[in-house]
């Protein structure tokens, strides 16, 4: 009995010291009449209560969970607004009674305050803590973000605006790197129109370089996995550049080298319409069974030679199989899904998923509602995970990652911006994926392919 009492005393003494440790979840308790009682319940659950008495405490603290007894907060409206905003922006698991709380976390059971059961909050807080620890110990990347399309609206990597992507939101979501996209709508393929597309693409790439260059203390451009890792070690975010639509190559293969010199790491061969390189998977194309043109084969060969990844996210099935056949290097799908889960033309069927794995490539799963299921408005993070889990089951854990397509149509309940990406890690843990697999999902797999593609180019 004395030993048990002594052990309890040790736990009581050391628990506050462990609050910022690797293992003990920290749960925020707002300044309310019942906070002492709440704190005792949290301690009994094996967590550490963080008393939040001022708005400074709210802004300065990183929690793993929070209690939100609506209407009980002492400090008034401003304090409450800050408290709820911190929870919403940082995706903190919580339990509460307000309408706002239900909107923030639709899965949480809403009970009258005196009947609140803390077990679910504690479980979520512990999983959230594990997710943070994992993501903070690896290089994490989202491989498709269309933020540059919003430059005219004032979007910028260094500003927290209405965009789904920014350095600030990356920090909240524990994301280290992102691929920013120079996107081109498909136009006529005559020589003059193609040259205009080339010029527009190069101009957009320069705009990305300029935007990232505005914030040297926050981020930098990366052309290789090693450069991204170096930026992470410096405490800065890494941005790669991708091009969506080979229309930007024009009719001159020399433009591929120009793009590589500027830092482009992958090119999506086409978009929603056929072009001079290949046919599209979209219904707007002429025939999805058709693949690479003769010029398209030359493009694939030159991309291999320059060390630029071939992205098959929009091309037709015929193009997919042609690239599997003709490319000397692994290929990628930077933002795609599983056709077996929902039969949209943007998804890959199981035969393609298996071939992608045999090729050594990777599929990065998107968050675009209309590609995930029939009801756009009701799609959630669970629908995204259904595609993700199927891809893992068919292709293997070494060949799957995340390519959200944020600011380009991506975003569902629970995963609607860089700040929400940690929620995917929580879902991965709940599904039972191992830390090693999760490291692969969040960057290891994609970076492996990038290294191999660049290595093959250097050997040639």
PLM feature segments, named:
Residues 122-286, 343-402, 406-460:
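N-terminal hydrophobic targeting/anchoring segments and the immediately downstream early-domain regions
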Residues 7-16:
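Bacterial N-terminal signal peptides
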Residues 35, 68-85:
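Conserved phosphotransfer microenvironments
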Residues 269-279, 284-353, 364-369:
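Active-site core of metal-dependent hydrolases
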Residues 1-4:
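Positively charged n-region of N-terminal signal peptides that target proteins for export
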